[in-house]
């Protein structure tokens, strides 16, 4: 156990975590030259395409340092704010962390929030200055920022470059010297923390764990404490690039267990594995993840509902932060109400459903969770979808979630950033200059305002320099209302949205204009209306396709023409009473891009 080191890599997006991990694997000969490719650990196509890490990945390296053999367990973590839950799970399984800071970008919001996560868990932090080979690198200034943030020694910051392979040896030496070996007693009752799982269609569910106390042998009968189910450890082993089976593993190690589990709901991340014969106490796991954004996901063909359910269950194994429950919509039939961590997470889930499971899905307007208080008996209703909103007459008041957002940006862009946040109903609470050129702004904002396109806009106005991190600070009373969209007098529940009263008219008008362009012409005219309760606030008309019934009248009497036109009008009216309007997927997506 003395020679085991468990560590993870934390950094902001694009500061070079995955590239540095590649170099460490190459340097310790964990990966042969033949297997080497960029972002070795990012095994989803989606991750490679977007160049981001979505899942945490664990891998074991062997390294000989000063004549002794060490086992290093590396857990690579995502950097995006939507996936901070993945990071917190990885941190719980480690004793140390490499904090990577880009020498050209400096410290960003995500760096700080992940660092606080690591410090709360008493991890040993090794600061690494990455990308020092870039022409725009400012190693001395960034070192000052790191010293100020961590209060560490200037010399303890390791200059490195993942691309050029500079400083890799120093990093490995620091991991061995500075990170403490895992504590734990191999003879105590077994306690192993589950930090990830994935589905293998041949072998059932593979569970990744970190042993805190005790020893597990192949063939042992184990129990998952939270769920209370018992299994046999058919295969246990360590995670190299491929899995390597072992006969026994003891405290301090990170590995996987396969026991033919078929049911997705039997494995919960954060659960504890122990022996049936000699049970240990459950480990205090992580806080349950709280979804921030809710949206409906529906199959395009109603017959595919069961396939979609199976796909969602398999996806949940690998993505512990996805929450869902079945729901029905008048317009779209059966589907699921899903909770996501943010908009990027929602996009990724939708893309993974399409790629990995061949499901074409329709997503409805994303919304956040509101609390509606009724006038009768002080009752509280949780509103996750616009259709859950009680009638306006029964409402006393509504509360919406607020967040504290920390934005770090260059001094030149402070003005535009502040005005963007003011537009989004934000209040500025603090402004500090980290260096002469970098400012940290703290805002309190309604979560609903940043769900849509806040992040994109922030990047646009700051030329890509601003970085954002946010946390929930609770619910506050707010003047929000439900806006309905009606087509020919029928409400389309999937297009409803909950918006702030001040923005309702503008939103309704723009949405009607957008839908008018997107809904294909029918044989009858379609009235597109936006309504609050019974009051119509905007209307557009999609004109009908019509035949020129006067084509056969050359000259002729006006009354003859009028007769033909009246006849056509009656026919169109009859069609409108029985006709259904098909809403294209583009119409649902349009709502997300109303501002552009």
Swiss-Prot record:
Keyword Signal: no
Function: Required for accurate and efficient protein synthesis under certain stress conditions. May act as a fidelity factor of the translation reaction, by catalyzing a one-codon backward translocation of tRNAs on improperly translocated ribosomes. Back-translocation proceeds from a post-translocation (POST) complex to a pre-translocation (PRE) complex, thus giving elongation factor G a second chance to translocate the tRNAs correctly. Binds to ribosomes in a GTP-dependent manner.
Enzyme Commission (EC) number: 3.6.5.n1
Binding-site residues, GTP: 14-19, 130-133
Catalytic activity entry: GTP + H2O = GDP + phosphate + H(+)
Stored PROSITE patterns: G_TR_2 (PS51722)
InterPro entries reported in the protein's UniProt record: EF-4, EFG_III/V, EFG_V-like, EFTu-like_2, LepA_C_sf, LepA_CTD, LepA_IV, P-loop_NTPase
NCBIfam families, alphabetized: lepA, small_GTP
UniProt cross-references to Gene3D superfamilies, sorted A to Z: 3.30.70.240, Elongation factor 4, C-terminal domain, Elongation Factor G (Translational Gtpase), domain 3, P-loop containing nucleotide triphosphate hydrolases, Translation factors
Entry protein name: Elongation factor 4
